[in-house]
């Protein structure tokens, strides 16, 4: 039987000092011997997705203590990608993922915690905590802060739904009046919570459900809704149940690496493709898989992208649906149910929402779907749960409203979630492209690409930084037919792999959204749509071909054939490569770029791998 990890600091006379310190935190005599459950919170007043999390740790703790555990909360950092966007702050976003993972590991291992609840929400926080949870491999439950309500405003007497990207595009569009731009800005982000579309934060919170590490509704229940309170309480109860199964019953199915195994990663990626999730999820799933010692690679993603249909279309891919609409249609469990009926899901994987009593099928995703898939459940409480809707009242308070939709969206022919027969498209919302531009692959969010742009041929317009590209787009350098190339923005070359939401938004605002393509070794916000191809690997700073592209080069993109090609002969490419090598210390570095890079970012860059490896640390440089 596994011994409680916390016994290291709570048992034996030689631990009298540690026990004295535990007592100073509020631990009583009769508490020693109980499991110590770490609560990793990420409250901050900087981020709307986290501004309401201050009291959530206490809520989880109350359920843990009622179930017989000791709850101890700590906090991690949280960067708001939207506020950090478009300036030097974005260099810190992806590296913060590694800091979050490390900080969770440090706190949990330093204090010998027995299990973990992760209270996350936004872009790098959920992935960072996921990496830590799989690294630690102790019982864990994820519970996020939830999505914000979609914005709503009237323009020309017409009520429209909005999100963050609408505010950015309107602000850069000279055809939008100052009055309308201000109205959109004030309405786009009305409540606390992660931005309201299928952007990175919501995509990742949905994927934790598919991985089996969070409860049904985690990815879709609004931050403002009173029903979300129960998710926090249940997270506390479930982590205690998992801890008892592992430490008292020697049940290793309660451990995250036995839940989030290869099949579970396939489920998560299948969901991601089906719902047209953010391309950043590829980066984070690859990173998490490495922490779990799961051999899940770009080749698996490429294979799956050809098989999985696009079943759920949400902003920014359409203005019609937001996360509140996904929830009304059954949330993640509704999408997984359709994937199961299409024969595309592994339902024999374990899930934290299900008890494993040893009988066949118990503790698995199959049993969770039987209860929570709105198309098959007979549980009226579950149906009531998925009818939770928005109130339309601006607020930063969690659980501040209890509005309901009049009915569920069970329309699998024309609704928010479709069956395979009526899919938005028979190929999914993400694709892996490869060719001489990206020998190790690159990612495009096909859910946001207009059908007319699935094949594209254009002339390269090369920029050595995002800043230069923005200036070029707004200054009129970029014209219809161009392929904007932004390089040296990868994990190592940026460093930090900036998001390119501003360049893509400005292309739209100038009427070039369907007339140009953009490729980069950086990445894109979950709010990006259009022919935007990121994660080019190897990156420019690692010797990738993207560093050899010159202005005017012909670039051919063919999404159906999964191809991206620089139409330059091998002889010419080899000559360019030799010329680059001849530059010595200046080889594979941006020409003329003026950018301050702090010591912290330089340390990150020294160990960073390219995007096809998840932009994680290069372990070969750390292992003996």
UniProtKB/Swiss-Prot annotation:
Modification sites for N6-carboxylysine: 124
Pathway info: Amino-acid biosynthesis; L-isoleucine biosynthesis; L-isoleucine from 2-oxobutanoate: step 3/4; Amino-acid biosynthesis; L-valine biosynthesis; L-valine from pyruvate: step 3/4
Gene3D superfamilies listed in its UniProt record: IlvD/EDD C-terminal domain-like
Single GO cellular component term: cytosol
Active-site residues, record numbering mapped to chain: 525 (proton acceptor)
Alphabetical UniProt keywords: 2Fe-2S, Amino-acid biosynthesis, Branched-chain amino acid biosynthesis, Iron, Iron-sulfur, Lyase, Magnesium, Metal-binding
InterPro entries, sorted: Dihydro-acid_dehy_C (IPR042096), DihydroxyA_deHydtase (IPR004404), DiOHA_6PGluconate_deHydtase_CS (IPR020558), ILV_EDD_C (IPR056740), ILV_EDD_N (IPR000581), IlvD/EDD_N (IPR037237)
UniProt-listed Enzyme Commission number(s): 4.2.1.9
The keyword Lyase is assigned to this record: yes
Broad enzyme group: lyase
Cofactor note: Binds 1 [2Fe-2S] cluster per subunit. This cluster acts as a Lewis acid cofactor.
Residues that coordinate or bind [2Fe-2S] cluster: 122, 195
Co-factor(s): [2Fe-2S] cluster; Mg(2+)
Entry binding sites for Mg(2+): 81, 123-124, 499
Keyword Transferase: no
Gene Ontology molecular function terms on file: 2 iron, 2 sulfur cluster binding; dihydroxy-acid dehydratase activity; magnesium ion binding
Pfam family, one: ILVD_EDD_N
Superkingdom per UniProt: Bacteria
SUPFAM superfamilies the UniProt entry points to: IlvD/EDD N-terminal domain-like, LeuD/IlvD-like
Function field: Functions in the biosynthesis of branched-chain amino acids. Catalyzes the dehydration of (2R,3R)-2,3-dihydroxy-3-methylpentanoate (2,3-dihydroxy-3-methylvalerate) into 2-oxo-3-methylpentanoate (2-oxo-3-methylvalerate) and of (2R)-2,3-dihydroxy-3-methylbutanoate (2,3-dihydroxyisovalerate) into 2-oxo-3-methylbutanoate (2-oxoisovalerate), the penultimate precursor to L-isoleucine and L-valine, respectively.
Subunit (UniProt): Homodimer.
Record-linked NCBIfam families: ilvD, PRK12448.1
Entry's family note: Belongs to the IlvD/Edd family.
Protein name per the record: Dihydroxy-acid dehydratase
Source species: Shewanella baltica (strain OS195)
Gene behind this protein: ilvD
């Amino acid at each position: 039987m596994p011994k409680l990890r916390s016994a290291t600091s709570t048992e034996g006379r030689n631990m009298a000092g540690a026990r004295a310190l535990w007592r100073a935190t509020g631990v009583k005599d009769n508490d020693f011997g109980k499991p110590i459950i770490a609560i990793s919170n990420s409250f901050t007043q900087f981020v709307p997705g986290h501004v309401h999390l201050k009291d959530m740790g206490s809520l989880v703790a109350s359920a843990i203590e009622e179930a017989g555990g000791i709850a101890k909360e700590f906090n991690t950092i949280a960067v708001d990608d939207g506020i950090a966007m478009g300036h030097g702050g974005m260099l810190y976003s992806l590296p913060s993922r590694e800091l979050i993972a490390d900080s969770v590991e440090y706190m949990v291992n330093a204090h010998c915690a027995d299990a973990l609840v992760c209270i996350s929400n936004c872009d790098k926080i959920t992935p960072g905590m996921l990496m830590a949870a799989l690294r630690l491999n102790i019982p864990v439950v994820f519970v996020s802060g939830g999505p914000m309500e979609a914005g709503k405003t009237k323009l020309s007497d017409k009520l429209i739904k909005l999100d963050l990207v609408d505010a950015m595009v309107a602000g850069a569009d000279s055809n939008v009046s100052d009055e309308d731009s201000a109205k959109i800005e004030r309405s786009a982000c009305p409540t606390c919570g992660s931005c309201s579309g299928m952007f990175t934060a919501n995509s990742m919170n949905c994927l934790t459900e598919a991985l089996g590490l969070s409860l049904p509704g985690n990815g879709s229940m609004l931050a403002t809704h009173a029903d979300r309170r129960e998710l926090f309480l249940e997270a506390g109860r479930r982590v205690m149940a998992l801890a008892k199964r592992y430490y008292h019953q020697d049940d290793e199915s309660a451990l995250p690496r036995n839940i989030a195994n290869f099949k579970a990663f396939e489920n998560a990626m299948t969901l991601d493709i089906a719902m047209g999730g953010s391309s950043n999820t590829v980066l984070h799933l690859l990173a998490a898989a490495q922490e779990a010692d799961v051999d899940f690679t770009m080749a698996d993603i490429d294979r799956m992208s050809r098989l999985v249909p696009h079943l759920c279309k949400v902003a920014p891919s359409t203005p019609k649906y937001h996360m509140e609409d996904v929830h009304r249609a059954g949330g993640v469990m509704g999408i997984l149910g359709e994937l199961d009926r299409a024969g595309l899901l592994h339902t024999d994987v374990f899930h934290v929402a299900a008890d494993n009593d040893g009988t066949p099928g118990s503790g698995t995703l199959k049993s969770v779907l039987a209860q929570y898939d709105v198309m098959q459940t007979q549980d009226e409480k579950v149906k009531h749960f998925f009818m939770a809707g928005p109130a339309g009242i601006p607020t930063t308070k969690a659980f501040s409203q209890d509005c309901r939709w009049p009915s569920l969206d069970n329309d699998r022919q024309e609704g928010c979630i479709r069956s395979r027969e009526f899919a938005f498209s028979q190929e999914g919302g993400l694709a892996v492209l490869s060719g001489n531009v990206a020998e190790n692959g690159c990612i495009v969010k096909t859910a946001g690409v207009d059908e007319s742009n699935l094949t594209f041929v254009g002339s390269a317009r090369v920029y050595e930084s995002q800043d230069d590209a923005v200036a070029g787009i707004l200054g009129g350098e970029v014209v219809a037919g161009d392929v904007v190339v932004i390089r040296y923005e990868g994990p190592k070359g940026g460093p930090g792999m900036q998001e390119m939401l501003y360049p893509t938004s400005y292309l739209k605002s100038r009427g070039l959204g369907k007339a140009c393509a953009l490729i980069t070794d950086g990445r894109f916000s979950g709010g990006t749509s259009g022919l935007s191809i990121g994660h080019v690997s190897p990156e420019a700073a690692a010797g990738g071909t993207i560093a050899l592209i010159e202005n005017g080069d012909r670039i051919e993109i063919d999404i159906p054939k999964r191809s991206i090609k620089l139409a330059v002969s091998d002889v010419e490419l080899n000559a360019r490569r030799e010329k680059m090598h001849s530059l010595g210390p200046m080889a594979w570095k941006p020409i003329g770029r003026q950018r301050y890079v702090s010591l912290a970012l330089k340390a990150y860059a020294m160990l960073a791998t390219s995007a096809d490896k998840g932009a994680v640390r290069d372990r070969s440089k750390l292992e003996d």
